[in-house]
Each structure stands twice: as C-alpha cells, then as structure tokens.
C-alpha cells in the first residue's frame, strides 16, 4: 500500500546528534526506505535558526527528491511581508504544498486576524493550512492557544479553507472529534501522539482513542497519517498505524488517499 507521511521535520532537536541539513535529509530518506514510506511532507518551523532551516533552505535541499514535499511554516512574530510574498511565489511555482501555523508555540489564537492573510492565500491556491494543536514540545508553549476548539472559529469563518488539525488536539482528542464532526472543511493528522517509540500500553491506549474518534466522527475521510519524525520514531509509528482496526478502504484513506487529495500529490 502507498504510504504518505504528512508530518515530518528536518529540524535539529536538543539532545540528538547534530547533523548538517543535507545529512538530516539523507537520514529521512533512508528511514522512509526502511519503512516503505513513499512520500513525506516536510514542515518548516515558526522560526529560523541554525537548528531550524527556513522554507527556502528546505526547498533547496529537497529539490532533487520527488518523494519529498514542503509545507511552509508561518508566524506572526518570526515572518514579515517579504516572507509572506515568498510564500505566494512558492505556491505559484508549485514549490510548497500548504502552510503551517504553530499556535501555542507562538502565543496567538488561530483566529487572530493577523493570520487571516494566510488563510486567504491558502484558499486562493486551494491548499490546506496545518495548525498545531495540543501539547507543545517546549514548556514555553502556552496551551490555551493550542486547544483544538479554537479551530472551530477558523473553520466557520472560512468555509472554503481546508484545515488540518495537527496531533488530533492531543490530549483534547474528544474536543477535536467535535470540531471535525461539525466542520466538513476540517481534517486532522495523527502525528506526534508519542515522543520516541510507543510502549505496548500506550499504543493500545492511543489506538482506542483513534477508534473512538472514528466512531464519533464517521468515515475517516478526514484523518491523515503522519508521524512527526524525528520526534516520533517512524517505524514505531508505522506499526501503530498497522494495528488500527480499519477496513481496507478506510486504511487507504488514512495512509495516503486523504493526503494525496489535500496536498495534490
């Protein structure tokens, strides 16, 4: 079966061995080959520094690899008008597949009016916006900005906008269920539910949560497979997804068809 991982990073994270960006890219490609992952979508960050490459750097380092696509991170504090115009140009040229907001990491609600130009741009080019929800990797994140219920306002006010709620809003998965059920323009990825590898107990626990999600919101036409590599182990995540009790058609929707349609891959 085709596999699209819609949520990976090429950042260097504290506590891991530092590798130059080119070597990180090769590590991602090797990990994909080992897991039979056909395509990955690389997300740039809400800030640029030696550990977090810019969208432009990611475009450059992945341009030789047809199995890697880019989603551009955008922030209120870390990006300016010139950065925004670059995103427009990259969308026009087909170099990025969508936009990503990091609510919680930066302390603004997703319905802050300063994000509206990002939503308008995504609507104009027919691409999704991905929005961080739930727990943050850093303790400096502020969780009230990352609650999935905040996405409801964006979905209602922008009915033509395709929104991907990252991480199922974990730990507020039940609230994310309602946002998805209510808003037909809202989707969610299952990435980043664990740091590192799943333990047997936690794997069963999260599988039950995903099952409950599906039972509440219906057919998984709105769920996308993603890992959050390298924060989450790709092989462990693939094993987790394989154990989800899904009919073949539903599994295909989760593992590649939904992402294929949303990101036009």
Identify the role of each PLM range.
Residues 1-10, 19-39, 218-222, 232-265:
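Mid-to-C-terminal alpha-helical segments outside catalytic/metal-binding sites
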Residues 3-6, 41-44, 71-73, 100, ...:
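Active-site neighborhood of phospho(di)ester-bond hydrolases with catalytic His/Asp-centered motifs
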Residues 7, 32, 58, 99, ...:
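Conserved, mostly hydrophobic/aromatic
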Residues 7-13, 132, 167:
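Histidine-centered divalent metal-coordination motifs
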Residues 10-23, 136-138, 197-198:
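Acidic/histidine-rich helix-loop elements
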Residues 38-39, 49-145:
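Active-site gating/metal-coordination segments in enzymes
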Residues 51, 172-176, 234-235:
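Short, well-ordered alpha-helical microsegments
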Residues 94-98, 111-224:
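Catalytic pocket-lining loop regions of alpha/beta-barrel enzymes
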